[in-house]
Design a protein with these regions (language model features):
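Short, solvent-exposed loop/turn elements at domain surfaces
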Residues: 37-40, 96-98, 130-132, 200-203
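Solvent-exposed loop and capping/linker segments of extracellular ligand-binding repeat ectodomains
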Residues: 1-55
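An acidic-aromatic substrate-binding cleft motif
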Residues: 180-202, 209, 215-217
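Hydrophobic residues within beta-strands of alpha/beta enzymes
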Residues: 4, 29, 193, 222-224
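Solvent-exposed loop/turn segments at secondary-structure junctions
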Residues: 35-36, 151-153, 200, 228-229
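Short loop/turn motifs at secondary-structure junctions
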Residues: 1, 25, 189, 218-220
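Acidic, contiguous N-terminal accessory segments
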Residues: 55-189
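Aromatic-lined carbohydrate-binding/catalytic grooves of carbohydrate-active enzymes
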Residues: 217-229
Length: 229
């Protein structure tokens, strides 16, 4: 999200957890003329006007992952330093997934060099781990392993890692990841998001952006509600 436009002259009530995990200070808030001061002083809306801070923090004891994985086994007391990540090991068949992982590490941790790093991130395919789109993600003191039953499973494992790297405090970076083994697979064949351009016009570029976010949450079908007739 780069721009948020609000048409109300009086700031609507905004829940404390609204925009959770999103650095709203990097989003341009557009409001009606003459109402900027009201939004600047309104609870939770005022976060859009605060200056970003560079803060490093440790991850929570357990990760908030959507959808909740089928299994997550933690290793209390064991962590992995994110400062020593960077090197990616992957076969040529996972070149697309490797590029997506680079984007995740760049966006979440600011990593630019993917040829260095004491602790590697290994991508692999193992059909024996489960049905299509299943994956296993392991984080320990030596690095990160993401194994999928197929390339889609590897991609979904990367999307889970992406959520795990979201810090609790906005505009910060996680210093450590807690050791964990996550095993997951789709509960249903179709995971659908419905949008309603029947009642409100949605620009094509906005729809494309929705597809990107759908992938983050492992959804695979976009339902366009065009008419009630």
């Amino acid at each position: 999200i780069k721009t948020l436009t609000v048409l109300a002259t009086t700031p609507p009530q905004l829940a404390d957890d609204a925009f959770s995990g999103v650095d709203v200070r990097n989003i341009k808030l557009t409001v009606p003329k003459g109402s900027k001061k009201a939004y600047k002083n309104a609870p939770n809306w005022n976060r859009f006007f605060k200056s970003p801070k560079n803060v490093t923090e440790q991850c929570p004891d357990e990760y908030a992952i959507i959808p909740i994985p089928e299994s997550a086994v933690y290793q209390p007391g064991k962590t992995l330093s994110t400062k020593k990540l960077g090197k990616i090991v992957a076969p040529a068949s996972l070149a697309n997934e490797q590029e997506r992982l680079k984007e995740v590490l760049g966006n979440r941790l600011g990593i630019k060099n993917f040829n260095k790093g004491k602790h590697p991130i290994v991508l692999a395919i193992d059909e024996s781990i489960g049905k299509k789109e299943a994956y296993k993600l392991t984080i320990d003191e030596e690095g990160i392993n993401i194994t999928g039953a197929d390339a889609t499973g590897v991609f979904y494992g990367i999307m889970t890692l992406d959520q795990m790297l979201i810090p609790e405090q906005e505009n910060s970076k996680l210093a450590y990841l807690n050791a964990v083994t996550i095993e997951d697979k789709p509960r249903t064949k179709m995971r659908e998001l419905m949008v309603d351009p029947c009642r409100i016009f949605i620009p094509y570029e906005d729809l494309k952006g929705m597809v990107v976010e759908m992938a983050r949450y492992k959804m695979n079908a976009l339902h366009l509600h065009l008419t009630d007739d």
